[in-house]
């Protein structure tokens, strides 16, 4: 996997709530995320300021789970982001101060533009290589309204796969499924 030189040490918003430190292993398979070159993502969901769930997932596990999602759902999600996010303009704007403030990437929903402090729930997601966060389309934040839009696009098959994954990983019923994008 290619990545740019735009990276910084894993910032605190992506540290584990449980340990107060960066994630060290994949929440699915247990692989070492600090191994040089290890690619992974971190997703955290919040209800206001409270962490609802969090996980770190190696790229192999992500690819395996993504392969279980319906092609129709994946296409609808891609179309949704193409229609609602100007990724190039977002990256230009955010790269201006990426190294000074990771929070600038995470304080507003990348789709709706809402300030996350004004939402009931939100999720943040980042891409990482060993001890570093990569700035590309990641990191990003999604408000509850954007998540609701995305969930409506998912097929029953995809919702089932994501709910199975959520139940396996967290052993709880979530109001919205884990969105592995």
Language-model features: where?
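Short recognition patches in nucleic-acid-associated and regulatory proteins
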Residues: 20-52, 72, 103-137
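Short C-terminal domain-edge/linker segments immediately following a structured domain
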Residues: 59, 87-91, 139-142, 171-176
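Short amphipathic alpha-helical linker/capping segments at the junctions of internal repeats
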Residues: 45-50, 74-87, 130-132, 158-172
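Short metal-binding segments enriched for Cys and/or His
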Residues: 52-78, 134-162
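Surface-exposed beta-loop interaction hotspot
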Residues: 69-107
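Short Cys/His-rich Zn2+-coordinating modules
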Residues: 2-15, 37-45, 86-98, 124-126
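Short intrinsically disordered terminal tails
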Residues: 180-181
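Domain-exit/linker segments immediately C-terminal to small folded modules
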Residues: 91-111, 115-117, 127-129, 150-152, ...
């Amino acid at each position: 996997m290619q990545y740019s030189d735009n990276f910084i040490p894993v910032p605190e918003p992506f540290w584990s709530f449980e340990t107060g430190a960066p994630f060290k292993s994949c929440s699915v398979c247990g692989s070492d995320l600090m191994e040089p070159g290890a690619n992974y993502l971190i997703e955290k969901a919040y209800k206001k300021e409270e962490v609802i769930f969090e996980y770190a997932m190696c790229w192999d596990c992500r690819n395996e789970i993504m392969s279980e999602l319906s092609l129709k759902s994946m296409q609808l999600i891609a179309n949704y982001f193409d229609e609602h996010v100007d990724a190039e303009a977002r990256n230009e704007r955010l790269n201006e101060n990426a190294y000074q403030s990771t929070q600038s990437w995470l304080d507003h929903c990348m789709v709706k533009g809402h300030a996350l402090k004004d939402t009931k729930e939100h999720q943040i997601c980042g891409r990482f290589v060993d001890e570093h966060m990569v700035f590309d389309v990641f990191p990003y934040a999604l408000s509850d309204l954007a998540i609701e839009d995305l969930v409506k696009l998912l097929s029953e098959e995809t919702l089932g796969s994501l709910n199975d994954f959520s139940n396996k990983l967290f052993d709880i019923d979530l109001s919205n499924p884990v969105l592995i994008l």
